[in-house]
């Protein structure tokens, strides 16, 4: 019995394909969110501007940290789903797939830990304006640097996933071409055998007729 379309990802291979696209989409979403903070980070880390630049960055992160709880839970849910997708990919990986899936999982796990341990608490400190460990300007610069590190790790995840997809498609094309070549060879050999068989039968028929005429 054929599977219905809604259950086309029910088998192991289909589940891993769905997880691969889930990793790509969720990682790209998180990367885009963090990259948006560059509007504030560029003037606090890469080219530190006047005091007004740090005031603007503080206002920006205060607004981000004070986002509606639905927005926060949505982002955290996507982060959690990304980890689940990675685990689905890595489970039962064999051969060269281990290198791709384990590396991607390690990079994302590192980025997730860095975000939970450093980025999220730092934004909360900005919201509360409770600068204890560092002065305000230094704190904002460290927060910007943490954002950059997380973005680099997520970019690595995206590149690994895209590299695997590219390699998978190239391998599929090569396997399809190899299968077509083998099919053509089999057809050629079959035609050759049929031709030889027909020639043999023709020779035997001629020989039989010659013997009959002699008799």
Swiss-Prot record:
Entry's family note: To yeast SHR3.
Domain of life: Eukaryota
InterPro entries registered for this protein in UniProt: Psh3/Shr3
Name the UniProt record assigns to this protein: Secretory component protein psh3
Organism: Schizosaccharomyces pombe (strain 972 / ATCC 24843) (Fission yeast)
Location(s) in or outside the cell: Endoplasmic reticulum membrane
Segments of this protein annotated with the region Disordered: 190-215
Chain segments annotated as transmembrane: 22-42, 68-88, 106-126, 148-168
Keywords associated with the record: Endoplasmic reticulum, Membrane, Protein transport, Translocation, Transmembrane, Transmembrane helix, Transport
UniProt GO MF annotations: protein folding chaperone; unfolded protein binding
The protein's role, per its UniProt record: Involved in amino acid permease processing and required for the efficient translocation of structurally related amino acid permeases from the endoplasmic reticulum to the plasma membrane.
Residues in compartment: Cytoplasmic: 1-21, 89-105, 169-215
Phylogenetic classification of the source organism: Eukaryota, Fungi, Dikarya, Ascomycota, Taphrinomycotina
Gene Ontology biological process terms, A to Z: endoplasmic reticulum to Golgi vesicle-mediated transport; protein insertion into ER membrane; protein transport
Composition skew (Low complexity), residue ranges: 196-215
Alphabetical list of SMART domains matching this protein: SHR3_chaperone
Membrane topology: Multi-pass membrane protein
């Amino acid at each position: 019995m054929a599977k219905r379309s809604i259950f086309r990802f029910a088998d192991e291979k289909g589940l891993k394909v769905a997880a691969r696209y889930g990793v790509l989409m969720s990682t790209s979403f998180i990367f885009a969110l963090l990259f948006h903070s560059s509007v504030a980070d560029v003037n606090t880390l890469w080219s530190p501007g006047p005091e007004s630049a740090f005031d603007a960055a503080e206002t920006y992160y205060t607004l981000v940290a004070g986002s509606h709880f639905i927005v926060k839970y949505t982002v955290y849910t996507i982060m959690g789903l990304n980890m689940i997708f990675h685990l689905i990919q890595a489970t039962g990986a064999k051969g060269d797939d281990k290198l791709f899936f384990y590396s991607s999982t390690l990079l994302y796990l590192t980025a997730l830990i860095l975000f939970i341990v450093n980025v999220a608490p730092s934004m909360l400190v900005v919201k509360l304006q409770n600068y204890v460990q560092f002065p305000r300007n230094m704190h904002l610069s460290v927060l910007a640097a943490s954002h950059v590190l997380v973005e680099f790790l997520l970019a690595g995840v995206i590149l690994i996933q895209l590299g695997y997809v590219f390699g998978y498609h190239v391998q599929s094309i090569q396997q399809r071409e190899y299968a077509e070549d083998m099919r053509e060879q089999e057809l050629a050999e079959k035609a050759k055998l049929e031709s030889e068989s027909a020639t043999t039968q023709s020779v035997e028929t001629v020989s039989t007729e010659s013997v009959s005429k002699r008799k």
